[in-house]
């Protein structure tokens, strides 16, 4: 039986495990998907050694960047992004070859593109973690300018207290890559001047639990178009499977 899995820490609820095991059952695929909750990326070697049937891994927080040093090959896109969330495991004789890809950028780009209008030129990306790198790459591929927003002063970022109503009017696409507002903290939202939002504003939240975050709700009240991260999650899962099944 082939094995696939997810590495990260902590894992808690995993969409991928439920999705793939249901897929395997429904499609008669002799495989299982396992959560590998590892406190250190160094534990990856042990997982590979003790699971010779392993064909592929998804990678989540906090290892999307750290996993790269363990890989034999990285796709040009994942290399440019600087983050990997899909690993293909190939066995050639006694040798194990690890290939890294990024399906986050595929899922995000495909899911936001239908909502981009001609008046959407500039984007605020909330957060600076591994997911935000893929989001930045995807937005630029769609022709949008991007600026990162952080709680801390970092090169190439602006802080939340610098986001005025004027900034919101200019940067009218806002993508939340932070966990702020995720269940169970549903009464929290990024500190933004929501009153400046209008029908030209597009809010995209990578969070999918709850279905509508407070970030989305407050924007919607001002006429903004809003979207959560569930479709991105599904599309990146489709892309993960495609990467694992490639014959190359």
Task: Describe each region flagged by the PLM.
Residues 8, 102-105, 112, 116, ...:
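Glycine-rich adenosine-cofactor-binding loop
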Residues 156-227, 231:
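Rossmann-like adenosine-cofactor binding region
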Residues 2-115:
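Phosphate/diphosphate ligand-binding glycine-rich loop within oxidoreductases
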Residues 110-111, 225-248:
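Active-site capping/gating segments
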Residues 87, 91-95, 144, 198-201, ...:
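A short helix->loop->beta-strand "cap" motif at the edges of active sites that frequently abuts
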Residues 34, 124, 147:
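Conserved beta-strand positions in the Rossmann-like core of class I SAM-dependent methyltransferases
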Residues 141-159:
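NAD(P)-binding Rossmann-fold cofactor-contacting core
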């Amino acid at each position: 039986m082939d094995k696939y899995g997810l590495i990260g820490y902590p894992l808690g609820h995993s969409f991928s495990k439920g999705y793939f095991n249901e897929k395997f059952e429904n499609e008669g695929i002799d495989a299982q998907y396992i959560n590998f909750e590892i406190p250190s990326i160094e534990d990856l070697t042990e997982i590979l050694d003790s699971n010779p049937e392993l064909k592929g891994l998804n990678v989540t927080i906090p290892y999307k960047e750290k996993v790269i040093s363990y890989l034999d090959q990285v796709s040009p896109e994942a290399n440019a992004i600087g983050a990997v969330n899909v690993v293909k495991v190939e066995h050639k004789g006694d040798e194990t070859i690890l290939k890294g890809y990024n399906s986050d950028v595929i899922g995000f780009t495909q899911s936001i593109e239908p909502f981009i209008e001609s008046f959407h030129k500039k984007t605020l990306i909330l957060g600076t973690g591994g997911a935000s790198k893929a989001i930045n790459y995807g937005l630029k591929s769609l022709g949008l300018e991007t600026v990162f927003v952080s709680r801390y002063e970092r090169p190439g970022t602006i802080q939340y207290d610098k986001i005025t109503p004027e900034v919101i009017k200019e940067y009218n696409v806002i993508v939340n890559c932070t966990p702020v507002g995720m269940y169970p903290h549903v009464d929290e939202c990024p500190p933004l001047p929501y009153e400046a939002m209008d029908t030209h504003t597009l809010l995209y939240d990578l969070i999918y639990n709850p279905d509508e975050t407070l970030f989305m709700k407050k924007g919607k009240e001002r006429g903004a178009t809003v979207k959560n991260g569930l479709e991105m999650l599904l599309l990146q899962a489709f892309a993960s499977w495609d990467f694992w099944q490639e014959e190359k």
